[in-house]
């Protein structure tokens, strides 16, 4: 297999026919070499299928979180039935942001599913790559700022996850 071109060659031996077997001429076996291009996109298709499954799982988790938080409320009597405390997600701005952010993430995931299916069907589609190249070459400042914002967002998410784990450990010890 030629590693530079990505093609493999296979030899096809063609035996002599019955009409030439009985002749006393020299026997020649013809060998034809055909270039066989391997079917590409195998690993890309696998990655695309894994991407699609992860998107569906993330969509299910985001929708479950949004629905659970959005429908959570409780009324607690305090001393008597006349004085009551009511807790709802919209009492705290953090929980409201949580519901809105998960709703937006769910919408994004729903809208991105057709593109994920397209990468499964056609793993060699170059439109997305070309669009990224166009944005990177034309909007250099924009791409750098977006990259920085995404990295900062991931750092914030990791810190928040760490804070949740730390809070869980602190609550467990009490």
Swiss-Prot record:
<keyword id="KW-0472">Membrane</keyword>
<feature type="transmembrane region" description="Helical">
    <location>
        <begin position="47"/>
        <end position="67"/>
    </location>
</feature>
<feature type="compositionally biased region" description="Polar residues">
    <location>
        <begin position="8"/>
        <end position="18"/>
    </location>
</feature>
<feature type="topological domain" description="Cytoplasmic">
    <location>
        <begin position="1"/>
        <end position="46"/>
    </location>
</feature>
<comment type="similarity">
    <text>Belongs to the Casparian strip membrane proteins (CASP) family.</text>
</comment>
<protein>
    <recommendedName>
        <fullName>CASP-like protein 1</fullName>
    </recommendedName>
</protein>
<feature type="topological domain" description="Extracellular">
    <location>
        <begin position="140"/>
        <end position="150"/>
    </location>
</feature>
<feature type="topological domain" description="Extracellular">
    <location>
        <begin position="68"/>
        <end position="96"/>
    </location>
</feature>
<feature type="transmembrane region" description="Helical">
    <location>
        <begin position="97"/>
        <end position="117"/>
    </location>
</feature>
<feature type="transmembrane region" description="Helical">
    <location>
        <begin position="120"/>
        <end position="139"/>
    </location>
</feature>
<feature type="transmembrane region" description="Helical">
    <location>
        <begin position="151"/>
        <end position="171"/>
    </location>
</feature>
<keyword id="KW-0812">Transmembrane</keyword>
<dbReference type="InterPro" id="IPR006459">
    <property type="entry name" value="CASP/CASPL"/>
</dbReference>
<dbReference type="GO" id="GO:0005886">
    <property type="term" value="C:plasma membrane"/>
</dbReference>
<comment type="subunit">
    <text>Homodimer and heterodimers.</text>
</comment>
<feature type="topological domain" description="Cytoplasmic">
    <location>
        <begin position="172"/>
        <end position="174"/>
    </location>
</feature>
<dbReference type="InterPro" id="IPR044173">
    <property type="entry name" value="CASPL"/>
</dbReference>
<feature type="region of interest" description="Disordered">
    <location>
        <begin position="1"/>
        <end position="25"/>
    </location>
</feature>
<dbReference type="InterPro" id="IPR006702">
    <property type="entry name" value="CASP_dom"/>
</dbReference>
<dbReference type="Pfam" id="PF04535">
    <property type="entry name" value="CASP_dom"/>
</dbReference>
<feature type="topological domain" description="Cytoplasmic">
    <location>
        <begin position="118"/>
        <end position="119"/>
    </location>
</feature>
<keyword id="KW-1133">Transmembrane helix</keyword>
<keyword id="KW-1003">Cell membrane</keyword>
């Amino acid at each position: 297999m030629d590693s530079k071109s990505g093609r493999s060659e296979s030899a096809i031996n063609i035996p002599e026919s019955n009409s030439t077997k009985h002749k006393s001429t020299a026997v020649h076996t013809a060998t034809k070499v055909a270039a066989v291009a391997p079917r590409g996109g195998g690993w890309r298709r696998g990655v695309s299928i894994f991407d699609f499954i992860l998107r569906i799982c993330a969509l299910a988790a985001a929708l479950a979180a949004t629905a659970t938080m959005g429908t959570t409320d409780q009324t607690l009597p305090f001393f008597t039935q006349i004085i009551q405390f009511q807790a709802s997600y919209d009492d705290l701005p953090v929980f409201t942001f949580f519901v809105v952010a998960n709703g937006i993430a769910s919408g994004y995931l729903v809208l991105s599913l057709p593109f994920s299916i397209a990468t499964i069907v056609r793993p060699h589609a170059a439109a997305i790559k070309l669009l990224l190249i166009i944005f990177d070459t034309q909007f250099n400042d924009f791409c750098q700022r977006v990259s920085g914002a995404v990295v900062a967002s991931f750092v914030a998410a990791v810190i928040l996850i760490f804070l949740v784990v730390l809070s869980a450990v602190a609550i467990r010890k009490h």
